[in-house]
UniProtKB/Swiss-Prot annotation:
Location within or outside the cell: Golgi apparatus membrane; Cytoplasmic vesicle membrane; Endoplasmic reticulum membrane
GO biological process: fungal-type cell wall polysaccharide biosynthetic process; GDP-mannose transmembrane transport
Highest rank taxon of the organism: Eukaryota
Lumenal side: 62-71, 128-134, 183-200, 255-274, 325-327
SUPFAM superfamilies in UniProt: Multidrug resistance efflux transporter EmrE (SSF103481)
Bilayer-spanning residue ranges: 41-61, 72-92, 111-127, 135-151, 161-182, 201-221, 234-254, 275-295, 304-324, 328-348
PANTHER family (UniProt xref): SOLUTE CARRIER FAMILY 35
UniProt organism field: Aspergillus fumigatus (strain ATCC MYA-4609 / CBS 101355 / FGSC A1100 / Af293) (Neosartorya fumigata)
Name recorded for this polypeptide: GDP-mannose transporter
Record keywords, A-Z: Cytoplasmic vesicle, Endoplasmic reticulum, Golgi apparatus, Membrane, Sugar transport, Transmembrane, Transmembrane helix, Transport
Function, as annotated: Involved in the import of GDP-mannose from the cytoplasm into the Golgi lumen.
């Protein structure tokens, strides 16, 4: 009986089938569920590229807006606010499981502290240069840092420079010469005190030279130190900003004027909210740059990211012409175009080098630590 009951459980009762349906077709294949719209949007290559470019432009424009105030002289305070905002932002992202990075370790902090000092020198001199120079000129002159880094790697890491890379360096130098000539020519020919304008430009060029030296020292030192700590993208950002906060606080209170009169000059009542908002937004933009560049590499490729980084110089330079009173002359536009072409040639040279086997040729993309370490350096240079 038990066996009959089991058999009956698996018996197909044919009389319950639909005899009117003579076509026994195979069932249609199951349709794979499509990913959610948000996931499809996140994997669209256009979105991360636009987000990366927008973040770079945002950071440069916000910094220039704050620094272009007529009497602004609290540069260390600006950098301290940016570091605090950055730490709060990435810690919030870590708690939200958007990013991951190491917890604080005192031994790692001691190893990394010299790099943080180089970073402070780099961002401070960069802020001073941007204060005196227009965004297009500042962007063009930042290309010279690439040359110093390249030959620093030749000296200390046993690399070499290819012919195409050398050609791009020549274009970078040429664009810088044209930009400086255009700036000085405009200052001399424009109305007002030409001597004061030229002296302001000269101060900007001196700060720019110091910034190029500090930036190359920071990048080369970071490459060597990363080998000891094995830091990833946001590890570097976390330690850089966390360790720089106490140093910047000491420097701003010791070296900058915190009298009520100077605070009123730096933060006039009519623009106070706008300046503070720009400070916060510039700090957030450095996080945006690192996140969007890693996103760009993940969705596209490192080759595409290299080209985007080169092409991004043009909209950053143009933002100075659009949002600020940078002179629009034939020499200044020519300098932007030549600098733009030099960036493309340099990116192509990097791509060709990465496609070849490693035979002692200088890795012009700098240390291939991770997908967005280069992007973080770009954010600091912007």
């Amino acid at each position: 009986m038990a066996d009959d009951k089991k058999t009956n459980e698996y018996t197909i009762e044919m009389d319950k089938l639909d005899h009117g349906n003579k076509d026994f077709e195979a069932p249609a294949p199951a349709v794979r569920p499509r990913g959610p719209p948000v996931a499809q949007l996140a994997n669209n290559p256009i979105l991360p590229v636009l987000a990366y470019c927008g973040s770079s432009i945002l950071m440069t424009v916000m910094n220039k807006y704050v620094l272009s105030g007529r009497d602004f002289n609290l540069n260390f305070f600006l950098l301290c606010v940016q570091s605090i905002v950055c730490i709060v932002a990435i810690q919030t992202c870590k708690v939200s499981k958007l990013i991951t990075y190491r917890d604080f370790n005192s031994d790692e902090a001691k190893k990394w502290f010299p790099i943080t000092l180089l970073l402070i020198g780099m961002i401070y001199t960069g802020s001073k240069a941007l204060q005196y120079l227009s965004i297009p000129v500042y962007t063009i002159f930042k290309n010279l840092t690439i040359i110093l880094i390249a030959y620093g790697e030749v000296l200390w890491f046993g690399g070499s420079v290819t012919g195409l890379t050398l050609f791009s360096f020549g274009l970078m130098v040429l664009s810088s010469i044209i930009a400086a000539w255009a700036d000085i020519k405009h200052a001399v020919e424009s109305s007002g005190d030409a001597t004061a304008k030229v002296s302001t430009l000269n101060a900007g060029y001196i700060w720019m030279l110091i910034n190029c030296l500090c930036t190359s020292s920071y990048v080369l030192g970071m490459r060597k130190r990363i080998k000891l700590t094995n830091f990833k993208d946001f590890d570097t950002m976390f330690y850089n900003n966390l360790l720089s906060i106490p140093v910047l606080l000491v420097l701003t209170f010791l070296m900058e004027d915190w009298s009520s009169a100077n605070i009123a000059r730096n933060f006039p009542s009519t623009d106070r909210n706008g300046i503070l908002f720009a400070m916060i937004l510039s700090g957030l933009s450095s996080v945006f740059i690192s996140y969007t560049s890693a996103w760009c590499v993940r969705v596209t490729s490192s080759t595409t990211y290299s080209m985007v980084g080169a092409l991004n110089k043009l909209p950053i330079a143009l933002s100075g012409l659009i949002f600020f009173d940078a002179p629009v002359t034939f020499p200044s536009v020519s300098a932007i175009v030549v600098g733009f072409i030099s960036g493309i040639v340099y990116a192509v040279a990097k791509i060709k080098q990465s496609a070849k086997p490693k035979t002692g040729v200088l890795p012009m993309s700098n240390p291939p630590v991770s997908a967005s370490s280069q992007s973080m350096r770009d954010s600091l240079r912007s």
